[in-house]
Amino acid sequence: RQAICTAPGPQTAKLLEGFRPTLAMAAASTSYAPCLAAMVAFAERPTVEWCAASIQDGPLSFVAEDNARPGHQPALAPSRWILHASASWSAEHIEENPEVFAPLMLEAFGQLPGVQDLDPPVHLRGHRWRFALVEKTTTSAAQVEGTPPVAIAGDWCEGPRIEAAWSSGVRAASAIRKALT
């Protein structure tokens, strides 16, 4: 049967090696930066002068109040915040347990300008995204290989944005359809 593999490049390379070698080599040529994330909830909204921030220096690169997003629960208890670590900080801490890095990220949140006196959270959870930020896309033009046809798709095929992932998926589906006719 035909298939489209949309896993991150390094995972796709392992899945396809020895099975679809041209696609495996294309996938292996990609590289990623990791991103550690934390979700923190407070019983009451902390004193924070903003609801989202992109941060240039330090352990964190992005912070957002989840309750403030359109279509989400209004800013009532619990107050939920998403913390993303910088690529360099994430790379340094990627092998740590989430129970170790999430409190460090919470501490960094408490030290940001405009954040005052954080109460202890009612919830704190960390998550590892090993393949979060595409640093190098594949240089291969190969999209589909073999019989039955297997195609590759993802942000690592065309560019590090969701639009590129979508476009790549459409192209992969078209390549599969063409290979079947």
Where are the language model's segments positioned?
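Generic secondary-structure boundary/loop-capping signal
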Residues: 12-13, 24-27, 37, 52, ...
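Residues in well-ordered beta-strands of folded domains
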Residues: 39-41, 54, 64, 84, ...
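Anionic-ligand binding region
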Residues: 48-83, 91-93
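Conserved flavin/dinucleotide-binding core of flavoenzymes
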Residues: 76-181
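Central helical "cap/lid" subdomain
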Residues: 1-53, 115
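Short, solvent-exposed loop/turn segments at secondary-structure junctions
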Residues: 6-12, 45, 68-70, 86-90, ...
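Structured loop/turn residues at beta-strand edges in well-structured enzyme cores
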Residues: 1, 58, 119
